[in-house]
Amino acid sequence: MASLSGPISPTNLEMFKPGVEELNPSKLLLLSYHQEGMLYPTILGSLELLSFKKERSLNLQRDKVCLLHQESQLLKLRGTGTDTTDVLLKQPMATSVNCCHDGIFTILEQDRMPKTSMAPILTESSGSLVTRLMSIPRLTFSIGTQVAMRLFRLGFRLARYSLRVTILKAQEGLLLIPDLLHAHPVEPLVQDRVVEPILATEPLPLV
């Protein structure tokens, strides 16, 4: 107690001075951003400072893109005698809609060009092609039938044997048609077509 009642030395006064924390440059920078109304991370570290700078640069880049678009639209209207006061009011609304959160500026989609439909053309071409393909077997079968009749009349054994094998294979194919249609469906025009019997006309001369 006696020591406390005596004179206080300068060293004792320094012990009672409140400690003042020195702010480093990064904290001062964050505080200046806070005064401008910007948000900053709660942890004052180097990683948070880098992420904050990156986010702020993206925001500035997005604003720059939107402002450039607005100025370019006004420059186009300048010198044409158009009143740009109404454009100044409407342009920020369109800019806020077109500016995405990731900084990418999207252009409003213009009226699409009318596309010519190719469906009727393809249908007509496919129909004519199917008709042409259906006429080819009919002509082939008519010629083959006439030749087969002449060969049977002449009595060539080899010709008759080959014709019998061909006819048996054709009959086997006719029996397998329903299964083939389920595995490989074809167009209704070909599937629903009724095979008409071919009448033999005048016999063709054998070469």
Swiss-Prot record:
Note: The gene encoding this protein is included within the N gene (alternative ORF).
Predominant location category: virion
Family: Belongs to the coronavirus I protein family.
One Pfam family recorded for the sequence: Corona_I
Record's keyword annotation contains Lyase: no
InterPro entries linked to this entry: Corona_nucI, N2-like_embe-CoV
GO CC annotation: virion component
Gene: N
Record bears the keyword Ligase: no
Keywords for the protein's UniProt record, in alphabetical order: Virion
CDD domains referenced in this protein's UniProt entry, alphabetically: embe-CoV_Protein-I_like
Function (record text): Structural protein that is not essential for the viral replication either in tissue culture or in its natural host.
UniProt name for this protein: Protein I
Record organism: Bovine coronavirus (strain Mebus)
Locations listed in the record: Virion
